[in-house]
């Protein structure tokens, strides 16, 4: 095992313009796995023409859309904490400047599963309808066993995946801790997204000794061989929360939502919270974190 610790700027250099970017999430909760530290750095570096794959496209995807980083989004849900469609995503889609691929929760999960298992697709029964041709990569086929028509759900294979965890060692072995107990994304979708991706950027609240990882293997959800970069990023999920570390910052979420309603105000938001802080430590100091 090699030491994979690096800076957020070096880690994000793994992402190229035009790549497919997988973001492990779900929505705002104390169990969020969203690497907002990496999302902000992607916007800061001005990455362009990205396809973002995110189970629930929310603030993190909206920030990248508003920063001009995206050409397309793929999701099973797209909403802003019960307040409708995220403002930048809505505005850009209405203007024809952002495309979308929509899944059901089940088809998205199967796509991530196929990618994590190294398969090209997974068959799905019961989804064959007149909407299938509208998805650019789905196909129907006849079962070789009984001739039944099935849907081939294409594997989701990000070029780069982002994930934030409570703790990890320097090699990339990562633990979700209490997150595993109540979060389907931590238990299944996030690890599969990591396995599916060609490269993985992992940010973490703290870096712990490998001996501690070995002592609590039941809490380890990601293994070193799937991770390419490890970045220490306290408050790295903010304004989302992390179980046992901090709660979601709902005031900041509302501040973001108000700023994103207007392009000029959103540019000011980016200047303050994305372009000005040089890395996770500076961002944590800006928001008053430890």
Where are these regions (language model features)?
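Conserved alpha/beta enzyme-core scaffold
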Residues: 1-290
